[in-house]
């Protein structure tokens, strides 16, 4: 007989929230550590088109890619912030330096992670372009009270990582 594991709504939602945010949720902090802080930002453009999501095989490949990237990012205590798939391609945004997972060598961790992502994605016949930048930027929740909000990073550091990825 097949057994099913039962999860609470809270447990399911935690899987959708960056690990660095969970301590703020536990104490009821509304702003989730919104601040200007030193972060390392990685943008990774993946060799996957939006049309890939139209088939079961394509969706399985996308899931495999995201799982591969997550494993590498989490291994060195980074955070997968966002996956965007649109007509311009597919991009992952990853962060290092979010409290409580902040380290003096976050930039080195991001670079090593980038190399590991490229190595692992090559094994599943997927290319990627990566851009990494470090410095001071805003990180926190953006949006309107009573409406949709999301955790984001804003500033020149994030923009530079995106430009490096695209060059």
Predicted features, each with a name:
Residues 4, 29-33, 81, 129, ...:
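Short, well-ordered helical secondary-structure segments
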Residues 4-7, 16, 24, 32, ...:
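Phenylalanine-focused residue identity feature
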Residues 64-79, 113-125:
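Generic non-transmembrane alpha-helical segments
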Residues 38-49, 77-109, 120-156:
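Catalytic core of nucleotidyl cyclases, primarily class III adenylyl/guanylyl cyclases
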Residues 58-65, 109-113, 157-160:
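Hydrophobic alpha-helical membrane-association signature
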């Amino acid at each position: 007989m097949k057994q099913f594991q039962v999860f609470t709504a809270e447990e399911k939602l935690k899987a959708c929230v960056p690990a660095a945010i969970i301590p703020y949720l536990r104490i009821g902090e509304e702003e989730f550590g919104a601040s200007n802080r030193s972060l390392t930002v990685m943008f990774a453009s993946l060799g996957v088109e939006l049309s890939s999501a139209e088939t079961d095989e394509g969706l399985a490949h996308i899931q495999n890619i995201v799982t591969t990237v997550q494993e590498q990012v989490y291994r060195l205590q980074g955070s997968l912030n966002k996956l965007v798939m649109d007509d311009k391609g597919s991009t992952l945004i990853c962060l290092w330096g979010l409290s409580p997972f902040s380290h003096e060598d976050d930039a080195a961790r991001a670079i090593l992670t980038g190399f590991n992502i490229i190595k692992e994605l090559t094994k599943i016949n997927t290319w990627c372009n990566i851009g990494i930048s470090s410095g001071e930027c805003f990180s926190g929740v953006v949006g309107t009270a009573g409406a949709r909000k999301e955790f984001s990073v804003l500033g020149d550091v994030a923009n530079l990582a995106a430009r490096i990825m695209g060059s």
